[in-house]
């Protein structure tokens, strides 16, 4: 399907600041289909985690979208793929008790209203397992795609296409005024690690609740989308508290 040319750049969302991140994809045909979905909707930054090189089947299914594949970047882990981005939106088919999950429409609206100049990652997981808890913990926001109750999940390429098409086509104003950018994900993660370390030293986090509390903390601080000013304040507070404990 060819999209109307005149509608391609009228929504003001700045497609160049969005990256599609595929974590641990297995089927290279799906990677090619994702590239095609990106080219159809005007997005070009594809990041692959856990993939060393693309196989021929990826190029076979890309169909006139080979440039997206040729420019794709490869990362050894999710932290490396997201460290320079400001906000991460992760798609999941399962509702998790420890992660606040947004409806798709809310996620799209939040994406469109993200601060001008912020770099945003759209994170999608492995075809069989989806995103693991550790991967969801690297996101600021987690969302689900609407689907019939009897169908457990979308194909990877379909999930990417639905998300990108919603960003591409739905009307809505661009951000009307400059906002403070969130800190990069690398800086946000450093802050979260300090908070978790303090909670562990205080005894609040222990062996029995470590996974649950850690996921709750990551979900909370992710949704706050800490700015550099927020991060510096929290780091100062928690680092000072840690230093006092050492004395």
Question: Could you describe each region identified by the protein language model?
Answer:
Residues 1-247:
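Post-transcriptional modification and biogenesis factors for structured RNAs
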